[in-house]
Amino acid sequence: MYKRATYRIRSNEPLTETVYRMVVEGDTQYLTAPGQFVNIELPGRFLRRPISVCDYDGHTITLIYKVIGEGTAQMPGMAAGGEHDMLTGLG
């Protein structure tokens, strides 16, 4: 089962030049194990971006992503406090 909801970005920090850690706040009830993924809606993009879940707790989801193409190149600019539509509990 999956859930569509709006999630608030708590942090979005570089780990390397192309790898980032993003922590989002919101409902995590449909996540059951690390390795599942979320689909993040990005402005101006038809397709959502699938990103693997690194960790989660009752209110936050930690995502690790690599900037590879035009879609993920937008993600480092997603600032703390911003809100984005996501599908969770996938995979």
List each language-model region with its residue ranges.
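Ferredoxin-reductase
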Residues: Y2-G82
